[in-house]
Structure formats: C-alpha cells, structure tokens
C-alpha cells in the first residue's frame, strides 16, 4: 500500500487523558522491547518510551517520522524507521511485544503480517470494533487461522470521539497472546485448505456424507452456526484421519 493511501486512512489519538486510559489495559514493564506500528505524531510513542526498555516505531510517512523524533527529543531509548510495516522484516532472535493504532483499511494485512511473520509474544492493537468481533467469529477464515497461533481478547472499547479526524465507528483495544501453535508445521498447508473449504461451506470437498456426520458427532456439534475453535480443531483432526 502506498504512503498516500496510508495517510488518508489514519486517525490519531492525541489526548494524554485518553491515551492513559488505553495504556492501563496494556501490560508493559521497563524490560520490554516494543515495536510500534505507525508512530503517527508520537503521542503513544512518548508513553511507550517512558514505560519500556526500547521502542522501535515503524512509520511509512516521512513527515510523521520527523514529528515523532522531535516530540521525543529528550529520550534516547527509541528509533523511528521510515518503512512500510507490510515490507518490514521482524527480528527472529529477540523477545519483543508489538503495539499499534492501525489503519482500518489494511487491518487484515497487518494482523496477518505480525502473527505469521513476527515472533512477538504479546500484540496490542487498536482496531475497528466490527473487525475485532470478526476475529472471534469461527465462521471467518482469518479468525480460524489466527486462533491456531494466538489467543485473542477484546480488552476495552475505544470510542470514536477519542480520534481525529473522528471515524464513523468505535474501535477496540485487542490483545493477541502467542501460544504454541495448535497446528504442526507439516499440517499448515492442509489446515489452510481445510479452513477455506469449511468457511465456504464446500463440505463435500473435505468429507463424504458419512464422514461429515461422524465428525460432527465426535466434535459434539449440533449447530454449524455456533461452533467453538476446539470443535473446529476436532473436525480438522477427523479430516486428517480420513485423508492419511
């Protein structure tokens, strides 16, 4: 995505009072290293450097990089990188957390990037409220792919009045806690295929009629519109058994 489109999709939170309310829900300490997705005008960056060991802010807008650097002139535990987060290479040999107030229109791309291309153990994001709810919906492919790697929680509402320009909808602060992957490396491709066929209701491409009924019974599923992630994993495990 180009810089112009990113800039036009940005909504900033600048009130220290509102930022402090959001920060109370984020677990940080003086030993944490943080990657911030989009420093904006540096308001969250300033709070992060006061709480953490080191902050690396990744900002695509050159002018906002300079604004952030000027705002943090009295601090030396940070760097601002003028880069596109979707092209950024996260380190693989250090512990870190991620925070970001991310653009609505590339939320899916960003969340895929940081879950599958980073090793962050905790990820805090401000996202559109409807998007946050979709991340908990097992009828959505993105939710099913993410739930195999992270535990997803909605921590708090972020009212649209906090932002300028003010968006049309409210936002949420979400947390993604990394866990041991529920899908083995050798099964990743098979899992991705199963997810896509399942959410598109192409059941005949993954089960025979008898296999389907037996798998539902084994998973304890009575309603296809209301299944848990554990039940979905049970279906996938049945699929693997039938396709050895």
Swiss-Prot record:
GO biological process, one term: response to antibiotic
Reaction catalysed by this enzyme: adenosine(2085) in 23S rRNA + 2 S-adenosyl-L-methionine = N(6)-dimethyladenosine(2085) in 23S rRNA + 2 S-adenosyl-L-homocysteine + 2 H(+)
UniProt key word Methyltransferase: yes
GO molecular function: 23S rRNA (adenine(2085)-N(6))-dimethyltransferase activity; RNA binding; rRNA (adenine-N6,N6-)-dimethyltransferase activity
A GO CC term attached to the entry: cytosol
Protein residues bound to S-adenosyl-L-methionine: 11, 13, 38, 59, 84, 101
Matches recorded under SMART domains: rADc
Domain of life: Bacteria
Keyword hit for Transferase: yes
Enzyme Commission number: 2.1.1.184
Keywords, alphabetical: Antibiotic resistance, Methyltransferase, Plasmid, RNA-binding, S-adenosyl-L-methionine, Transferase
CDD domains: AdoMet_MTases (cd02440)
Functional description taken from the UniProt entry: This protein produces a dimethylation of the adenine residue at position 2085 in 23S rRNA, resulting in reduced affinity between ribosomes and macrolide-lincosamide-streptogramin B antibiotics.
Family affiliation: Belongs to the class I-like SAM-binding methyltransferase superfamily. rRNA adenine N(6)-methyltransferase family.
Protein's recorded name: rRNA adenine N-6-methyltransferase
Organism classification: Bacteria, Bacillati, Bacillota, Bacilli, Bacillales
